[in-house]
């Protein structure tokens, strides 16, 4: 099965055919660095990191560009409020973004350009647009004329006349049409500026991505990505100005990830349901957040809630427990030539093919992880039955590891991950870990003395506080429910 991707431009899944055989050029809109990143940013960046990883796994040489928007109204407003230069704000939050992305296990893109380092390229594109009649200067500003580009709104499928008639749209004094957008903004007091043919000023948001993508990927490239919220106006305007300037198609495949909802409501600062990545990682392991974000298809909306994060943590823990069980069984004394379980052998051997088929169907990570859980269930059954051929278990481990390497998951040492998760859960309990261990010792003594009533009381007391005791021949361990 060849890779098929959903193209927002056509509204259908299409066979993925690159401009150059074996090479992919991909541009993804980065963040505006004026504040801490929220979980919507986490989703977009994890999704395109997954796509980046899978394309390389599939044998492509990938040039991946993700920018920083480091000059913008929001950055300037924050800088003025704090009384510092705008670049102090942008550099601070670039560093915060980089820390967040490293925690989430993202591979570095090929290039991470900053808008402020590409002003000359932006001015060159604007000059071409003015010369071709697609843009006009107006008292220090430069605007793109949407009526001059007859394919405007082809990405979002909106209607220009209906939008013009909308009550919320007002014609500015300088604009010829209410939907015309700024390519260059004349300087204002208290704002950074650069020299240009139209006077001192700074670029508009949309021209930044066009100029940077053209510099690193050329006038036409394979994939342009971002969140669904960028389809209009940002990506629509990028297409208009880029294709008007170059007379060529801009990007062939437009890929957009779905929204993040908070407890079934749209994430919004005004609703008070706005969570930064930093806040989430104080309560949850970074790999749990990444696993949660990849557990749904990238185009589907995803509901962020404590319950869903806890379920993701439990699912990831099941996988790590299976890996730990495999490692223990493979390392155990013996010949390793036990019974060969046909179901386990088939699922282990078949996982790479099933994984590829799922991912080739528009990067369906939800289906891919479903196949991993199928294998994990077979592993757990076989481990419980005992007397299994270690080579088959090792092949199951290798198959899961290969999937994890592509998705950026299952990279921790299993025992260490389980302990890390246990420690996080224990930190939220109303009882200290040392007290749990003391009660387990008391329970062991009670059982040895055949005081089963006291042993049961201790078990029930711990259960009421969310602690589950696990008795085995090796002793008693505990976990958080």
Swiss-Prot record:
GO terms of molecular function: ATP binding; cysteine-tRNA ligase activity; zinc ion binding
Keyword Cell membrane found: no
Residue ranges of the TM segments: none
SMART domains, per the entry: DALR_2
Keywords assigned: Aminoacyl-tRNA synthetase, ATP-binding, Cytoplasm, Ligase, Metal-binding, Nucleotide-binding, Protein biosynthesis, Zinc
Lineage: Bacteria, Pseudomonadati, Thermodesulfobacteriota, Desulfuromonadia, Geobacterales
Motif ('HIGH' region): 31-41
UniProt feature coiled coil, ranges: none
Top-level taxon in the UniProt lineage: Bacteria
Enzyme Commission number: 6.1.1.16
Any GO BP: cysteinyl-tRNA aminoacylation
Record Pfam families: CysS_C, DALR_2, tRNA-synt_1e
Residues the record lists as binding ATP: 269
Family statement: Belongs to the class-I aminoacyl-tRNA synthetase family.
Gene3D superfamilies in UniProt: Cysteine-tRNA ligase, C-terminal anti-codon recognition domain (1.20.120.1910), HUPs (3.40.50.620)
Statement: the UniProt record of this protein carries the keyword Acyltransferase: no
One cellular component term from this protein's GO annotations in UniProt: cytosol
Location of this chain's protein in the cell: Cytoplasm
Motif ('KMSKS' region): 266-270
Cofactor: Zn(2+)
Catalytic activity: tRNA(Cys) + L-cysteine + ATP = L-cysteinyl-tRNA(Cys) + AMP + diphosphate
Database matches in NCBIfam families: cysS
Major location category of this protein: cytoplasm
Organism: Geobacter sulfurreducens (strain ATCC 51573 / DSM 12127 / PCA)
Cofactor annotation comment: Binds 1 zinc ion per subunit.
Binding positions (Zn(2+)): 29, 209, 234, 238
Protein name: Cysteine--tRNA ligase
Subunit structure: Monomer.
């Amino acid at each position: 099965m060849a890779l098929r991707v959903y193209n927002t431009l056509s509204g259908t899944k299409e066979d993925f055919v690159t401009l150059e055989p074996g090479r992919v050029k991909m541009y993804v809109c980065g963040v505006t660095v004026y504040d801490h990143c929220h979980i919507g940013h986490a989703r977009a960046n994890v999704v395109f990191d997954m796509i980046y990883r899978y394309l390389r796994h599939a044998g492509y040489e990938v040039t991946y560009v993700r920018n920083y928007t480091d000059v913008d109204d929001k950055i300037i407003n924050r800088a003025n409020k704090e009384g510092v230069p705008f670049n102090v704000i942008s550099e601070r939050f670039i560093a915060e973004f980089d820390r967040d992305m490293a925690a989430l296990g993202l591979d570095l893109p090929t290039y991470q350009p900053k808008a402020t380092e590409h002003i000359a390229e932006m001015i060159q594109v604007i000059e071409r647009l003015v010369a071709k009649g697609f843009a006009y200067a107006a008292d220090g500003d430069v605007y793109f004329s949407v009526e001059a580009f007859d394919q405007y709104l082809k990405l979002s499928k909106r209607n220009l006349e209906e939008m013009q008639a909308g009550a919320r749209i007002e014609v500015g004094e300088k604009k010829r049409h209410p939907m015309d957008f700024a390519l260059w903004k004349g300087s204002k007091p208290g704002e950074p500026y650069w020299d240009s043919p139209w006077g001192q000023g700074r670029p508009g948001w949309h021209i930044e991505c066009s100029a940077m993508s053209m510099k690193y990927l050329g006038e036409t490239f394979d994939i342009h990505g971002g969140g669904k919220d960028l389809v209009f106006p940002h990506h629509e305007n990028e297409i208009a100005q880029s294709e008007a300037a170059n007379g060529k198609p801009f990007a062939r495949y437009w890929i957009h990830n779905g929204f993040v909802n908070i407890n079934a409501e749209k994430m919004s600062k005004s609703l008070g349901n706005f969570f930064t990545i930093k806040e989430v990682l104080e309560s949850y392991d970074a790999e749990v957040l990444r696993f949660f974000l990849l557990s749904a298809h990238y185009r589907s909306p995803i509901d962020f809630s404590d319950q869903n994060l806890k379920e993701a943590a439990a699912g990831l823990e099941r996988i790590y427990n299976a890996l730990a069980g495999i490692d223990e069984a493979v390392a155990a004394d013996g010949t390793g030539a036990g019974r060969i379980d046909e179901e386990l052998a088939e699922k282990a051997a078949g996982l790479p093919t099933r994984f590829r088929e799922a991912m080739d169907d528009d990067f369906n990570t939800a289906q891919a992880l479903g196949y991993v859980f199928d294998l994990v269930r077979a592993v757990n059954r076989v481990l419980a039955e005992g007397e299994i051929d270690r080579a088959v278990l090792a092949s199951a481990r290798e198959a899961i590891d290969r999937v994890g390497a592509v998705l950026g998951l299952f990279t921790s040492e299993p025992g260490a991950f389980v302990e890390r998760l246990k420690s996080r859960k224990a930190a939220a309990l109303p009882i200290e870990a040392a007290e749990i261990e003391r009660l387990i010792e008391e329970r062991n003594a009670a059982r040895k003395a055949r005081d089963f009533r006291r042993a049961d009381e201790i078990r029930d007391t711990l259960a009421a506080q969310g602690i589950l005791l696990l008795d085995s021949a090796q002793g008693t361990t505990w976990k958080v429910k």
